[in-house]
UniProtKB/Swiss-Prot annotation:
Pfam families: Ribosomal_L28 (PF00830). One of its GO terms (biological process) is translation. The lineage of its organism: Bacteria, Pseudomonadati, Thermodesulfobacteriota, Desulfovibrionia, Desulfovibrionales. GO terms for cellular component: ribonucleoprotein complex; ribosome. The gene is rpmB. Coiled coil: none annotated. This is Large ribosomal subunit protein bL28.
Amino acid sequence: MSKECIFCGKKPQVGNLVSHSNIKTKRRFNPNLQRVRHQFADGSVRTLTVCTRCLRSGVVTKPLVRKQG
């Protein structure tokens, strides 16, 4: 799974982990990415890696779930 949002391009960032004695070591801040089925304008459906901000803002259009039988 890629660590980048398909729509906004959000990816991991580098920062510092700061201890009580103010010693700094490098760490990574990973975005909250989810794998979601997305329906495109032509009707095709693909599974994409999307951040939760894009999910909440309505960028992703989920396909209709049809009942069997």
